[in-house]
Design a protein with these regions (language model features):
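Short coil/loop linkers at secondary-structure junctions
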Residues: 9-13, 83, 225
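C-terminal catalytic lobe of FAD-dependent flavoproteins
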Residues: 197, 207-294
Length: 294
């Protein structure tokens, strides 16, 4: 991709914008890696096509917050015969003998505050797709997320008073190895009272102490903060193996990005490992990305 940038004489700041804000790369590795130009151009086209379709932004965000996404999954799952269970604890994962493949689970469904043992049940299966929290012995820590949730009473400066924004501060502009992400939503999304805004600043930890300093460039970009909440670093887990030996296929943890691009890559990866083929979305033409071209 460096040759493409050089051909058009693009400045460093323009390259940062294209690579990190449009193509959504988390690092600058794509610039010098061979064969990445096509992938980068497809990502840029997806961004441009999305802008053409939605107008103000290439992104769509659910009303009432991200909790609507699992609700949408639950409804779609039910249409295809799936069962979505809340307040359910996995008691045991069963395998066909030592070193065998997964064969089922034992679990207990119990509402919070409910007396008694709850509803115990057992179900058979041939594959399990799960996040790292269910199999702590099958994952490793590959990094840590730093995150601050801030309450504002004003829109972020120099964003045209937008009621929602995503800002990406490229790593090279703040002397870091990882980008800093800012996602802001407001009462327009029914997530807070009118006149208030919720901004989340996140990045990958690069030091073992003074984590608030790593988020400082993002926090400064917000302006005056009414209230700030920042917890301990959040571990990022990745599976130790593919899962083909025991048919337990694990996802990665969420990273610091605010646009879910890496999450969609993880979905494709876990599908490839579990099914042995690439994920093909029905009704989507090859090479079209996730947005139809006009």
């Amino acid at each position: 991709m460096k040759q493409v940038y050089d051909k058009f004489g693009l400045e460093a700041t323009t390259r940062d914008f294209i690579g990190h804000s449009m193509a959504l790369y988390a690092t600058d590795d794509y610039i010098n890696n061979r064969g990445m130009a096509k992938d980068c151009i497809e990502r840029i086209r997806l961004y441009a096509n999305s802008m053409a379709r939605y107008g103000k932004s290439p992104y769509i965000y659910p009303l009432y917050g991200l909790g609507e996404l699992p609700q949408g999954f639950a409804r779609l799952s039910a249409i295809f015969g799936g069962t979505y269970m809340l307040n359910t604890h996995i008691d045991e994962i069963k395998f066909d003998g030592p070193g065998g493949k997964v064969s089922g689970i034992r679990a207990t469904m119990k509402e919070r505050g409910e007396e008694g043992e709850g509803m115990k049940f057992e179900t058979k299966c041939t594959k399990i797709l799960a996040d790292p929290s269910y199999f702590p012995g099958k994952v490793q820590v590959v990094g840590q997320i730093l995150k601050a949730i801030c309450i504002l009473n004003h829109p972020i400066d120099r964003t045209d008073n937008s009621d929602s924004v995503q800002l990406i501060i490229p790593q090279s502009q703040v002397g870091r190895k990882h980008d800093i992400y800012i996602a802001m939503v407001s009462s327009a999304h029914n997530v807070c009272p009118k006149g208030y805004y919720i901004a989340i600043v996140s990045t990958i930890a690069e030091t073992s102490a003074n984590h608030h300093l790593e988020l400082a460039p993002g926090l400064e970009r917000l302006g005056r903060i009414e209230e700030k909440f920042m917890g301990a670093p959040i571990p990022i887990y990745a599976p130790l193996e593919s899962g083909v030996n025991d048919n337990v296929f694990l996802s990665k943890s969420y990273d610091a990005s605010s646009h879910f691009e890496t999450m969609t890559d993880d979905v494709r990866d876990i599908y490839r490992r579990a099914q042995g083929e690439e994920l093909v979305v029905q009704g989507l033409k090859e090479g079209q990305g996730l947005v139809a071209e006009e």
